[in-house]
């Protein structure tokens, strides 16, 4: 219990009034020192941890302890640049602990600039020192562009970055109008010079504007993109009796622009004309023509079988005609061959007799065709020797033989100077004929009775008839008398 001095100048409990007041004031101002006891910080808690040294860098101070509010400074060796804060301070935080502020630890990096990645370009060098210029080449159809069009150069900075880094550009990907598509992938943001873009509209829309756009050398498009406008759909296509239609594309949900309708007829019917398609164009069917199915006049259930049967009939008919013609030709050829190759021995007995020509009642025997050709008439067949035969043939060639009725003519020449007698007078005619006619054993010769009758008739006629001159123009044998 404290006792204060009264107004009468009494002393306080401490013996002096002024000292008592000072002590009381100290106690009242510092109550925690007397009432509450806080723990005392250790030595480790009174300093900051060593921040270390950056690689290829320097720290100041390099040694010592860092108490509260101590400062550490950093720098890098030549050829490297500092990344991060250049100085840090040892600071006490709200929880009473000490730490570095800012907390980011600095590092020293190489000052060489790494090659940048530039789309649609190739970088020539792999490393660049500060102050070096970037060297690139753009792909074909792309052109180099710099952010700063006045500098037109990219330089490696001291901190390893590039200044005024360029890009390789083509024409920027054009816009795609609604309800349309084009032949450029959505992943491409630029296209090289010379690229042609083809625009097309979805079904039910028509294109308004240029269909093709080209990327020009100045990296702009040749024209503005087109638009796709909605068009009116066509109404139901006209129906046909005994037939139906189908749509392309199938199914026919809506007859939009470009829809094609194909007509067909039921079995037993066919279209009246060959055209069977109509197309929806801008809300109208084209061509505007009436299609209808007509009944087939003749149905062919098995067209292939009937076609084969028809060919069989035609082939059989042609074969029959050819065979008939071949038979006729063969028969005709055989007929001519038989006529040309028939021998005298094959003739009947009536034709074996020599032909006799009656002139003014005189029967004149004529030589056969073979005898006239060979020139052996009035020559005994087996009596002449070879020499006489040659002279007789020579005489025959110079002077033709005399016919009965010629008397003492200057053209009459002896047939032979040998044993053969001349036939100069009608009195010797019988003897001449008897010697000239072949024997009865020779084919085609006359029998004795026929010879006698012929000779008697000639002798009787020769005495009363004048000399007979037979013209040389009379044919010996008619060509048409020999038949097969």
Swiss-Prot record:
The chain crosses the membrane at residues 311-331. InterPro entries: SUSD4, Sushi/SCR/CCP_sf, Sushi_SCR_CCP_dom. One of its GO terms (biological process) is chordate embryonic development. Residues 1-35 form the signal peptide. It is found in: Membrane. Residues 46-110, 111-168, 169-230, 232-295 form the Sushi domain. Disulfide bonds join 48-90, 76-108, 113-156, 138-168, 171-215, 201-228, 234-280, 265-293. The lineage of its organism: Eukaryota, Metazoa, Chordata, Craniata, Vertebrata. Disruption phenotype: Morpholino knockdown of the protein causes defects in development, abnormal locomotion and increased mortality. At 3 days postfertilization morphants have abnormally (delayed) developed eyes. Residues 470-484 have a biased composition (Acidic residues). Keywords: Disulfide bond, Glycoprotein, Membrane, Repeat, Signal, Sushi, Transmembrane, Transmembrane helix. One of its GO terms (cellular component) is membrane. It is a single-pass type I membrane protein. This is Sushi domain-containing protein 4. Glycans are attached at residues 95, 125, 183. Residues 374-484 are annotated as: Disordered. Residues 424-442, 449-467 have a biased composition (Polar residues).
């Amino acid at each position: 219990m404290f006792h204060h001095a009264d107004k009468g100048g009494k002393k306080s409990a401490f013996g002096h009034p002024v000292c008592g007041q000072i002590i009381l004031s100290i106690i009242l101002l510092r109550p925690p020192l007397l009432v509450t006891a806080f723990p005392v910080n250790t030595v480790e808690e009174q300093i900051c941890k060593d921040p270390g040294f950056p690689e290829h860098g320097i720290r100041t101070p390099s040694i010592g302890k860092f108490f509260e509010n101590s400062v550490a400074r950093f720098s890098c060796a030549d050829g490297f640049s500092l990344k991060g804060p250049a100085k840090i301070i040892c600071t006490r935080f709200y929880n009473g602990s000490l730490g570095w502020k800012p907390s980011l630890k600095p590092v020293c990096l190489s000052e060489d600039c790494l090659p940048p990645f530039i789309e649609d370009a190739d970088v020539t060098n792999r490393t660049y020192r500060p102050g070096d210029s970037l060297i690139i080449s753009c792909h074909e159809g792309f052109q180099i562009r710099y952010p700063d069009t006045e500098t037109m150069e990219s330089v490696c900075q001291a901190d390893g970055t590039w200044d005024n880094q360029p890009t390789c550009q083509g024409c920027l990907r054009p816009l795609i109008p609604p309800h349309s598509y084009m032949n450029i992938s959505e992943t491409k943001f630029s296209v090289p010079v010379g690229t042609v873009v083809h625009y097309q509209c979805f079904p039910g829309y028509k294109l308004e504007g240029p269909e093709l756009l080209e990327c020009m050398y100045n990296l702009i498009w040749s024209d503005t993109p087109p638009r796709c406008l909605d068009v009116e759909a066509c109404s139901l296509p006209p129906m046909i009796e005994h037939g139906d239609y189908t749509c392309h594309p199938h199914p026919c949900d809506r007859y939009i622009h470009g829809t094609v309708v194909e007509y067909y007829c039921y079995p037993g019917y066919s279209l009246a004309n060959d055209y069977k398609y109509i197309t929806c164009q801008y809300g109208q069917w084209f061509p505007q023509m009436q299609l209808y199915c007509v009944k087939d006049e003749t149905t062919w259930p098995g067209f292939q079988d009937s076609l084969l049967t028809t060919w069989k009939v035609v082939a059989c008919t042609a074969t029959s005609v050819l065979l008939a013609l071949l038979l006729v030709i063969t028969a005709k050829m055989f007929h001519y061959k038989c006529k040309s190759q028939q021998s005298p021995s094959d003739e009947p007995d009536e034709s074996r007799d020599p032909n006799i020509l009656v002139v003014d009642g005189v029967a004149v025997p004529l030589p056969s065709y073979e005898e006239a050709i060979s020139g052996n008439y009035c020559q005994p067949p087996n009596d002449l020797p070879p020499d006489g035969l040659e002279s007789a043939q020579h005489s025959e060639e110079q002077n033709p033989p005399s016919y009965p009725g010629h008397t003492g003519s200057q053209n009459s020449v002896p047939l032979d100077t040998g044993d053969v007698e001349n036939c100069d007078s009608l009195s010797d005619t019988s003897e001449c004929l008897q010697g000239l006619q072949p024997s009865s054993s020779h084919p085609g010769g006359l029998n004795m009775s026929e010879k006698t009758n012929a000779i008697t008739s000639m002798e009787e006629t020769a005495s009363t008839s004048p000399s007979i001159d037979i013209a040389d123009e009379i044919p010996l044998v008619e060509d048409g008398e020999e038949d097969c």
